[in-house]
């Protein structure tokens, strides 16, 4: 297998994995964070949250009338802790947003841009050959081997007197078209699996209620007419 195909498959697989794990990425980024700010802020937030919970439990266990001074003192502590926790939440959000931006830049530089460069550089690379030039019409062969730009460039080349098929030495499917078909197939399979496996089943009662509402709506519209 040619290195171009291997590289293209690598980028497709990595991008799909990132797409499927998008809901967990923030937790992973925070867990393996190299930023000392997020680590220290998270520890401080956990410490103050535990302290707030302890004071709340203590206030619930005592009577405000019998232990008014202690109850009031705890309330003042809770108010102070709420302010500190709110400040920590704000600082944590800023730190996490900054780290997410760094991750997105890293993804752009290591995945998105290299994949785009590969498609632009090797977009016309023939992944596999077509037996003969007569297998498909000339325009279809042109699109398969040259990409979708073949169609808008066709009249321009015709007016300039350039043969649009002069570069098609061997008919085949180019990398750009192959990647388009591959990603479309993956998306279709993914959609079917979601619908068959992960889509919640609508109960008969819900269906019957929906039908009743539709009938009532039609009856109301008929009465209005």
From Swiss-Prot:
The keyword Transmembrane helix applies. One of its GO terms (molecular function) is protein transmembrane transporter activity. GO terms for cellular component: endoplasmic reticulum membrane; GET complex; Golgi membrane. Keywords: Coiled coil, Endoplasmic reticulum, ER-Golgi transport, Golgi apparatus, Membrane, Transmembrane, Transmembrane helix, Transport. Residues 1, 129-172 are lumenal. Belongs to the WRB/GET1 family. Component of the Golgi to ER traffic (GET) complex, which is composed of GET1, GET2 and GET3. Within the complex, GET1 and GET2 form a heterotetramer which is stabilized by phosphatidylinositol binding and which binds to the GET3 homodimer. Required for the post-translational delivery of tail-anchored (TA) proteins to the endoplasmic reticulum. Together with GET2, acts as a membrane receptor for soluble GET3, which recognizes and selectively binds the transmembrane domain of TA proteins in the cytosol. The GET complex cooperates with the HDEL receptor ERD2 to mediate the ATP-dependent retrieval of resident ER proteins that contain a C-terminal H-D-E-L retention signal from the Golgi to the ER. This is Golgi to ER traffic protein 1.
